[in-house]
């Protein structure tokens, strides 16, 4: 593997992650902070590592990420999507494996807007019969 850098953009909800991957020892840096420091929740850290663990490249690549917008869950999902795209740039043969795990597809779910006359997006005001 050469010292080439691979890039992938990931999105989830309102978060956008720019992911750079290059040959290394498995360090993951998010917004100039180590992964364990940036994400307090173990589930978020697990989500970020999923594509690397699937293709067994956890200790072969260094990942550098800048992520903006959204909350922790959205950002973790965006980073996962970005890492997946960077891995596909590195080796297109990984696509079927990553596709079967559901990492290639962009999760299109977003918050539904609140409608006029309703309490929330779908919650209607309480109905009183009498």
Swiss-Prot record:
Keyword field contains Ribonucleoprotein: yes
InterPro entries hit by this protein: Ribosomal_Su5_D2-typ_SF, Ribosomal_uS9, Ribosomal_uS9_bac/plastid, Ribosomal_uS9_CS, Ribsml_uS5_D2-typ_fold_subgr
Keyword set, alphabetical order: Ribonucleoprotein, Ribosomal protein
Family: Belongs to the universal ribosomal protein uS9 family.
GO biological process: translation
Name of the featured protein: Small ribosomal subunit protein uS9
HAMAP family, per database record: Ribosomal_uS9_B
A GO molecular-function annotation: structural constituent of ribosome
SUPFAM superfamilies linked to this entry: Ribosomal protein S5 domain 2-like
Record Gene3D superfamilies: 3.30.230.10
Organism whose genome encodes this protein: Shewanella frigidimarina (strain NCIMB 400)
Annotated GO CC locations: cytosolic small ribosomal subunit
Cited Pfam families: Ribosomal_S9
């Amino acid at each position: 593997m050469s010292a080439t850098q691979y890039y992938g953009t990931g999105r989830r909800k309102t978060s956008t992650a720019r992911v750079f991957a290059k040959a290394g020892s498995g360090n993951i840096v998010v917004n100039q902070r180590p992964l364990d420091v940036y994400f307090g929740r173990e589930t978020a850290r697990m989500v970020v590592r999923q594509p690397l663990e699937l293709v067994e490249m956890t200790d072969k690549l260094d990942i550098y990420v800048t992520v903006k917008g959204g909350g922790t869950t959205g950002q973790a999902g965006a980073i996962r999507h970005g890492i997946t795209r960077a891995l596909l740039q590195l080796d297109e043969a990984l696509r079927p494996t990553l596709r079967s795990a559901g990492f290639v597809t962009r999760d299109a779910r977003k918050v539904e807007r609140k409608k006029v006359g309703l309490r929330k997006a779908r919650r209607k005001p309480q109905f009183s019969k009498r």
